[in-house]
A protein has these predicted regions:
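RNA-binding accessory domains that recognize and position tRNA/RNA substrates
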Residues: 1-210, 214-215, 229, 341, ...
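Residues that mark the start of a beta-strand
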Residues: 175-179, 199, 247, 290, ...
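Active-site-proximal beta-strand elements of phosphoester/diester hydrolases
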Residues: 177-182, 291-292, 332-336
Length: 364
């Protein structure tokens, strides 16, 4: 007996894709995006940068190794929804403690499988990211489109996923003190800093500069996070007030915030960069790094003219800015994720560079 479709997604332009539900069976309006990673769905599910987004996985089989307690990037996943071609509800992995569907149901994340994910991804590629409704199969198309038109994607994503109080992560041997501004930080970033001898004090996204100064850091880190960087003017102002006072390192949203603090501008990409195989050229070494990426916005290259920033990395797929620096202020940032999780580790040296800059500052 053929199983009947019970869920569907509706795009703003009226396209419908039918499939089967897994995870939570609630209705949601999200921004639809795609990720080209073959593995790492648990890290994607728990990456705060995907807040309010429905992620379409281009790799067809998802769920086959289950969910492991030690592999979450944050304890409370905030992904909007997950769309896959084929879902495996019987994982084979000795580390697995739950199925993907069980975790999604626990956190209210709807999923749909059985759709033509290649066709859907081509639509996103050709027409860009846009709003999508994940709903019941019986929802009329007209009603679905009306919901899409009347529902805005919230702009409070960073405040939703940031910590609400100061937290500290200690290293075994503590040589440096890093204050990390949490805009939706992945825990592998904290682990990467701890591993290099950094005590990490994690502060909320809207912590003012004077409060950070009072913590007496050796360096400041600005994390990844969801949404439009212009939605966090408080964080931008904090960085403006700290430029030139401490070594500063930013990743992803943190990279965009640093650029805005120097007077540059950002813009939204047609469909973003999401995956574990994006080639980036390091302009200082002329080497190619394969990087993990997850972002909807990029720094406007022309807007860097007249600022103190210089470009250090570019994306080889579309020539967008992937890294900037200001040597006199001991500031640098990258658009991609050197901590991976998931993805390659070609760029882990950037954490070592941050250590070197803090050491130089301490010895000055």
């Amino acid at each position: 007996m053929v199983k009947e479709f019970d869920r569907k997604i509706i795009l703003e332009d009226g396209q419908e894709y039918y499939g089967y539900g897994f995870g939570a069976h609630n209705e949601k309006v999200c921004e639809i995006v795609f990720n080209t990673s073959m593995v790492g769905y648990q890290e994607i599910l728990s990456d705060p940068s995907y807040t309010y987004q429905a992620v379409v996985m281009t790799y067809p089989l998802i769920g086959n190794y289950g969910m492991a307690d030690d592999d979450y990037e944050r304890d409370t996943p905030t992904l909007g929804a997950l769309v896959v071609r084929e879902y495996n509800d019987e994982p084979s992995n000795f580390r697995s403690t739950a199925t993907l569907s069980e975790v999604m149901e626990k956190f209210g994340i709807p999923g749909i499988y059985g759709i033509d994910s290649r066709k859907l991804n081509r639509s996103i590629r050709d027409f860009g990211s846009r709003k999508v409704l994940i709903t019941d199969i019986f929802t009329p198309l007209e009603e679905g489109i009306a919901k899409l038109k009347s529902t805005d994607i919230p702009t409070d994503a960073v405040s939703r996923v940031s910590c609400d109080k100061i937290m500290i992560s200690y290293a075994e041997t503590q040589k440096y003190h890093v204050v990390a501004i949490d805009c939706g930080m992945k825990m592998n970033i904290v682990r990467s800093l701890n591993k290099r001898g950094c005590k990490v004090t994690i502060v909320p996204w809207n912590t003012p500069a004077e409060a950070i100064v009072a913590l007496d850091p050796d360096g400041i880190f600005i994390s990844n996070g969801p949404g439009d960087p212009t939605d966090v003017p408080e964080t931008i102002q904090t960085i403006k007030n700290l430029l030139g006072k401490y070594p500063i390192f930013g990743i992803c949203l943190g990279h965009q915030i640093i650029s805005l603090a120097y007077g540059a501008k950002t813009y939204k990409l047609k469909f973003g960069h999401r995956g574990g195989n994006h080639p980036v050229r390091n302009l200082e070494t002329n080497k190619i790094e394969i990087t993990s990426q997850n972002h909807s916005y990029a720094v406007d290259a022309d807007s860097l003219n007249g600022t103190d920033l210089i470009v250090t990395h570019i994306n080889l797929l579309d020539n967008t800015i992937e890294g900037v620096k200001c040597d006199k202020d001991k500031v640098f940032s990258v658009q991609y994720h050197p901590e991976s999780a998931p993805g390659p580790q070609d760029s882990a040296y950037l954490f070592d560079r941050f250590i070197e800059v803090m050491e130089e500052q301490n010895n000055a």
